């Protein structure tokens, strides 16, 4: 079949043969790009500041799909994952459950629900017990931004005077040198990560709507899309 195609192409006038050559190049390039984006890499733009300063608003990042196809997510990974659905009318994001017919936020019929992808850091692995507790340190205004001194963190009031909190994994305090600022204490929390699932949080801990506040706190393995490797716009920067 390929031989017949080449013979047919050689019989075409020069201009048509040249055009066909270019068409072949574009088709092959598109096929390679499609394969790369669906099998090997994941390309994502970060719309919020929940991962600052590791990843800034508007950054574009590249992740490796192969990392989670042939391996397991590791604690500390910055991951791209499928969170759920977004209303096609008001763009309200819903969790992992199938998109409802009516948006619970705007009350409009959802005709074309959009898949929502988030970027967060893996904190809890299957079987882990994650606890968030006060660590006994007072949050200083030169460390915690003044705008958060009287903040309501997603409906949970921060302690007054402000006290910082820490994450404990299976009873041991987690070292988190990637945090933008100390996490404010909003009350004790405890999560037991089920088998085949993961617990993820944002690095900008005081401004991140993450697993602490989702109705379903855990992301199933099949929802984990890729491990973020680097930012490619604006400028190239490794993401750790």
Segments the model singles out, each with a brief description of its role:
Residues 2-20, 35, 39, 44-45, ...:
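Soluble "head" domains of membrane/secretory-pathway proteins
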Residues 48:
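A short acidic/basic microdomain associated with nuclease active sites
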């Amino acid at each position: 079949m390929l031989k017949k195609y080449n013979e047919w192409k050689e019989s075409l006038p020069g201009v048509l043969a040249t055009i066909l050559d270019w068409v072949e190049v574009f088709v092959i390039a598109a096929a390679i790009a499609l394969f790369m984006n669906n099998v090997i890499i994941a390309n994502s733009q970060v719309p919020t500041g929940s991962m600052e300063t590791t990843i800034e608003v508007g950054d574009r990042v590249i992740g490796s799909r192969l990392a989670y196809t042939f391996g397991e997510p590791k604690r500390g990974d910055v991951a791209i994952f499928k969170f759920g659905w977004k209303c096609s009318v008001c763009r309200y994001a819903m969790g992992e459950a199938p998109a409802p017919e009516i948006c619970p936020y705007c009350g409009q019929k959802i005709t074309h629900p959009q898949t929502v992808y988030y970027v967060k850091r893996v904190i809890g692995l299957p079987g882990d017990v994650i606890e968030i507790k006060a660590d006994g340190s007072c949050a200083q205004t030169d460390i915690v931004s003044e705008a958060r001194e009287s903040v309501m963190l997603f409906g949970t009031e921060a302690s007054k005077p402000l006290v910082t909190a820490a994450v404990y994994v299976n009873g041991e305090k987690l070292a988190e040198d990637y945090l933008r600022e100390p996490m404010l204490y909003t009350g004790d929390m405890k999560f037991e990560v089920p088998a085949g699932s993961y617990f993820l949080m944002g690095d900008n801990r005081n401004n991140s709507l993450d697993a602490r506040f989702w109705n379903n706190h855990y992301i199933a393995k099949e929802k984990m899309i890729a491990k973020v490797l680097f930012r490619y716009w604006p400028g190239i920067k490794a993401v750790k």
